Amino acid sequence: LPMLLPTITYGFAIIYSFGKQGLLTRLFGVQLFDIYGFNGLLFGYVIYTLPISFMLIHNTMGFIDKKFMVVSRVMGDSNTATFLQTVLRPLLGTLAASMVQCFFLCFTDYGIPASVGGEYDVVATVLYNEMLGSIPNFNRGAVVAVMMLIPSVISILLLHYLERYNVRYNKIST
């Protein structure tokens, strides 16, 4: 359900929870952290991208064969070696793809910076201000839009490249 909400809703949830008159601020009696600027952006982006990362990693964890862990333990590997070779190694492609996906979502997001970004500028707010600001400058806005396009294309190509590192097992026996 959180993935279906507009991103500005996350900013409003942060304001209503952690703001000066927020629910958690009233509960604890003190504002836990400054929600405007970098702190608010970081917190908003984490709660915005956490469900996507969780779904990707959880899905991959379902495809990891548990028999490899048993074999690793029988062969005398330590707990750390078992974890690194049988859990973390198959997850590397998904972890990298999750990081790229989260970067792409945060890079193109406008709602969270608009609500809790404060004076902290991100590319999406710069594009909005150039195109729809008080004095629109379409030439500069077009340059910013093209500059936004380059990391987006690189992200898509990187995701396509990382797809080959996803977990794939062929069943030899049942």
Regions found by a protein language model. Give the residues of each.
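Helix-loop junctions at the membrane interface of multi-pass solute transporters
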Residues: 54-63, 74, 115, 131
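Hydrophobic alpha-helical segments that mediate membrane insertion or helix-helix packing
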Residues: 1, 70-73, 127, 141
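Amphipathic cytosolic juxtamembrane alpha-helices at the membrane-cytosol interface
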Residues: 39-40, 64-96
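Periplasmic/extracellular loop-to-transmembrane helix junction in inner-membrane transport proteins
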Residues: 30, 84-88, 129-138, 174
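Glycine-rich helix-loop "coupling/hinge" segments at transmembrane-helix boundaries
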Residues: 110-136
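Transmembrane alpha-helical segments of polytopic membrane transport and secretion proteins
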Residues: 160-174
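Short membrane-interfacial helix/loop motifs at transmembrane-helix boundaries
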Residues: 21, 115-119, 171-173
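Membrane-water interface segments at the C-terminal ends of transmembrane alpha-helices
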Residues: 1-62, 90-110, 141-160
